[in-house]
């Protein structure tokens, strides 16, 4: 199965206006030229290598600045195909407000079926064949709760440029969009069309939560409106804005990250995948944890035979003579 990565650099050049819990490190990069932190380079390499090893070819959508940077750090050979034309010509999008729009709009260039793969999503095996028997496949659903989700009343009072979509269900599960299989052309077309309507906000200010509505929220709406059959890699459902509690804390009523529906298939969890996701928030506050994770990514890339992609000088500190040889 073909997958795509998307690296749109426009948000970097608007980083002072970026909003969200995962941008602390990026916003602190002082360079005026495009640059990525080590962890982002490493998980991008690992994500691509793992996909190619287990599942098939991978294509990169980026812009000319992104391509030049990838050439500089020596990772363009990860990709079977690279497209810069689309993102070079992407216009009329605020990359600070809608920083995932580049990846969403790039989808419309692909022929089905294919997988969109966030660069921080690592698949460590062959995706089960029955995952592809449907219109759409996602990593998992999320229970919407907290500041990144909204009520109908919030939309009606805070969003001025467009009415809430007809039949929008604020209580329904939200699909995590870090890993999405598109099995038909209509799934892509309807998703991108709905997304583009929402981001046409002109000069209107929008609250921070709105970007997620234009990304995960609207995909869930499209799935329900068109009754697209949706498979998941796991039956576990992520609870947004949870307490990150451990099982022993249940007696106090603290909430955990993951929950199973009453009827579920635990055998799905034999399939191994990792989404760096929330760890990126922790990285900003715990640099030692970040360095341990970078070392883990580096070691795994090395063990997979990917040493050719680790020559970038910023990554040299993870090389260990005893562990990695000469």
Language model feature labels by segment:
Residues 1-91, 282-325:
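N-terminal anchoring/stem segment of glycosyltransferases
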Residues 38-41, 46, 88-116, 124:
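A conserved donor-nucleotide-binding helix/loop in the catalytic core
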Residues 53-57, 109-114, 132-135:
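Short glycine/proline-enriched coil/turn segments at helix->beta-strand junctions
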Residues 57-61, 115, 261:
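A structural signal for isolated positions on well-ordered beta-strands in alpha/beta enzyme cores
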Residues 119:
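Short acidic donor-binding/metal-coordinating loop in glycosyltransferase active sites
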Residues 123-159:
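Conserved donor-nucleotide/metal-binding helix-loop-beta segment in metal-dependent transferases, i.e.
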Residues 157-171:
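Short, flexible, basic/aromatic active-site loop/helix in glycosyltransferases
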Residues 169-284:
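Catalytic core and acceptor-binding pocket of nucleotide-sugar-dependent glycosyltransferases
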């Amino acid at each position: 199965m073909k997958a795509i990565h998307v690296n749109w650099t426009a948000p970097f050049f608007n980083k002072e206006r970026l909003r969200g819990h995962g941008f602390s490190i990026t916003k602190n990069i002082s360079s005026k030229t495009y640059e990525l932190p080590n962890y982002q380079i490493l998980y991008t390499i690992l994500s691509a290598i793992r996909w190619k090893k287990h599942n098939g070819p991978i294509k990169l959508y980026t812009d000319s600045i992104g391509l030049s940077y990838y050439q500089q750090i020596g990772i363009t050979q990860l990709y079977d195909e690279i497209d810069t034309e689309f993102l070079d010509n992407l216009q009329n999008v605020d990359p600070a407000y809608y920083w995932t729009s580049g990846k969403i709009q790039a989808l419309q260039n692909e022929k089905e079926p294919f997988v969109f793969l966030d660069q921080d999503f690592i698949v460590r095996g062959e995706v089960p064949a029955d995952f592809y028997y449907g219109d759409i496949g996602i990593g998992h659903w999320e229970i919407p709760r907290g500041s990144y989700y909204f009520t109908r009343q919030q939309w009606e009072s805070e969003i001025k440029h467009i009415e809430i979509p007809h039949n929008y269900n604020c209580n329904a599960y939200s699909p995590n969009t870090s890993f999405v299989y598109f099995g038909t052309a209509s799934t892509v077309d309807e998703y991108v069309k709905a997304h583009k309507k929402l981001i046409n906000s002109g000069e209107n200010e929008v609250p921070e939560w709105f970007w997620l509505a234009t990304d995960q929220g609207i995909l869930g709406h499209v799935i329900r409106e068109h009754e697209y059959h949706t498979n998941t890699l796991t039956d576990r459902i992520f609870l947004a804005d949870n307490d990150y509690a451990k099982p022993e804390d249940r007696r106090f009523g603290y909430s955990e990250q993951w929950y199973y529906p009453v009827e579920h298939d635990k055998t799905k969890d034999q399939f191994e995948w990792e989404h760096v996701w929330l760890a990126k928030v922790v990285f900003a506050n715990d640099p030692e944890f970040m360095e341990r994770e970078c070392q883990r990514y580096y070691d795994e890339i090395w063990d997979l035979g990917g040493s050719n992609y680790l020559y970038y000088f910023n990554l040299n500190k993870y090389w260990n003579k005893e562990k990695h040889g000469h």
